[in-house]
Amino acid sequence: MNIETLRKTAKQMVADGKGIIAADESSGTCEKRFTTVGVPCTEENRRIYRQTIITAPDFEKYLSGIILYDETIRQEDDNGERFADILTKKGILPGIKVDAGAKDLALHPDEKVTEGLDGLRERLAEYKTFGAMFAKWRAVITIGNNMPSDACIHANAHAMARYAALCQEADIVPIVEPECLIDGDHSIEKSYEVTVKALRKTFEELEGQDVVFEGVVLKASMVIAGKKAPKQSSPQEVAEMTLKALKETVPADLAGVVFLSGGQGDEQATENLDAMNKLGGVPWPLSFSYARAIQNPVLKLWAENPSANVGKAQSALIFRSKMNSLAAQGKYSSEMEKERPY
């Protein structure tokens, strides 16, 4: 483990208001998203769509990294150049999703545990040869009646810590993502309670595995009321409750925090990130690692005509990335949305 390499990479991931695009959807998730826009989910269509994202001009102004899927990190553009090499030339860090997905947690109905530790050391070594500089592992925590259980939080935190240790051993920065789902009708107070519990256990387990916090990036859920809650959360409430949860649980020497959008609306995710950065008062950079909240308009425009709409789709990608980059600096205003090219 080279601590300086890890620190340098982690710092680059959260520098200068830049964020990370999550383009690591599994083939199954891609199938769902492509079906909604009427595009067959073939391997070639997935390659062309990801090529549209990866070759967007000048998006390195707003992005520090892209999380790729196993299939994608092995793919090439139309000219035979590997996607990871294109990103590296742009100054964008290639990352890789390494978990094997959330599986049913034994004896705990409706709860999940993330698998994928078997063979991970060897997979990380291979991904490093492809140019991967960081990795991602996502745990899924459901908020509901008597959920999450202590067993669910512990099992996921322990697996995530072992993953993080293996990453650092390979000089790959781990993104740890304990996602508290926003499905359901829970209040923002319940979201806060669960988020604090999940984060506290995650960092306890990371410390137990001797993981170096300066070489870790947290991908955090925002503290927000469930989608079906009668009272929805304002950006100010989300900012106050989220920063309160982070201050209570996250070590000051962590490299940085990037937020997942978790099914929020595109502008909602941007507004909430901006509110947090305007509030400030935390020791870490606060940025974004969005999938749908950036890709929604991109996929829609591309799907209308995959060969002719590449430029339009890329303009949407650049615009949403720019809006979120401004939000990561507390410089966003909803008035700016009037300039959007879609």
What is the meaning of each model-derived region?
Residues 66, 135, 174-175, 216, ...:
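Hydrophobic residues within beta-strands of alpha/beta enzymes
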Residues 100, 141, 180, 222-224:
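Short, histidine-centered active-site or binding-site loop motifs used for metal coordination
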Residues 120-206:
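Helix-rich catalytic cores of soluble enzyme domains
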Residues 182, 186-253:
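Catalytic core of soluble alpha/beta enzymes
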